[in-house]
Amino acid sequence: MKASGVGLVFVLAAAWSQTLAGEEDTSATAHLVSQIDVRDFGAETARIGDLNADGGPDLLFVQSVFGTRAITCLTATSIFGEILWQTGSPSLDNGRIYSDLPVQIYDWDKDGKNDVLYVRQATYVDPAYDGKSPRERAPKYEGEARMIVLDGQTGKEKGGFALPAPADDCFLFADLTGCGRREDLVVKDRYWNIWGVAHAGEVLWHWEGSVGHFPACADVDDDGKDEVFVGFALIDHDGKVVFDHDAKGAHQDAAYITRAPDNTWRLLFGNGGIHCLTPKGEELWSHPLGEAQHVLAGRFRADSPLQFPVVDRTPVPHGRDDNAWGILYLYDLDGKEIWQRQQDKGAWAIAIVPVNWTGGGAPMGILVYGHLQGRPAVIYDGNGEIAATLPMAYTPSRDEKDRKADYYGLVADVWGDSRDEVILFGSRGACIYANPRLLETETHYNETLYPGM
């Protein structure tokens, strides 16, 4: 993404202040470029995208009722925390989550500007909400769920359509109709049902089974339409089942589709292990693990084109307490373990995101957050070494309890320098880190009045 004018001003001002001080710490592994006062709209769910149509990225903070997952407030801000718009009522009590939330940023109507889409729940007739326990589905609903489309610049409602009542867990965009753009939807309930929905709101198909957390989609049969992978099953664009393995009461915690260097597809998912499948459902390799909660694919090392980072949150049975810990693994294309890194005690809920921290065509890094107790996020390189440490930066008004609240992470190139920045966000704070190391590009150090290199 191209940096906005305000972003450039901020960077130049920061660089100028460092020059005036005469001390720029070139050994630093990360530079704090934005510290956001989230006041009462902080959230453990956030999205990033250009909302005000100025060419630069913005943030969307999403609050919900913890137990019901009903979305209560959406707050759009600049990357420096300036509020662009807000819909709903913010509350310090509604920033926490236990699951994904059905909200995304996308140019839904193809007018060249982003919209915000979210699902408004149908009425759960029973069970009655007790005010604290998670409520994942109901035996009976009143009405239907509804996809709401908001104008990204103003937050005003501009459209919407009905969805099946239980379809309020999360959704993703896919090309199910062969239009050449991912403008159809895959929607689901928490664990049991999934629907394909056309852009106009028509339900194309419904599949009942172990759908897991968040599906993955790709055109693995090269017919111009996406297939939907839910871990134990692969569903074609028209709802026909390509394969469906017996989940035996389990569900996928993470799903990923990638193309190997030989142009064949790999379908990976995690649950009580990490599994690598072909598009026909044949298992190429697997490793039993306690709880493979996160699975990625990418080039994280220079010695081979594709590796798979995996998080095991439960390598030994535990009560999810301060004595529990997780393990980060890195596997090669054939499933051979390259390395593993056991986390500190208490860091069992870690999550991972691929991050282009170095840029310049270098291998990706692995952002690891969720160490709990206010501990910093870190970036691992492909050798299993920590390349950067990123503590959550809170505004001075936050007390010690706030500073130990959970927070999450996402990445995006907010400066337009070909490298990712890291955005950390939670119910009590948000901040953005950049890589301060010099990125050398030929056009930066060989400038000329007569371009033509």
Q: Where are each of the predicted segments found?
A:
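Beta-propeller-forming repeat regions
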Residues: 18-453
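Bacterial N-terminal signal peptides
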Residues: 5-15
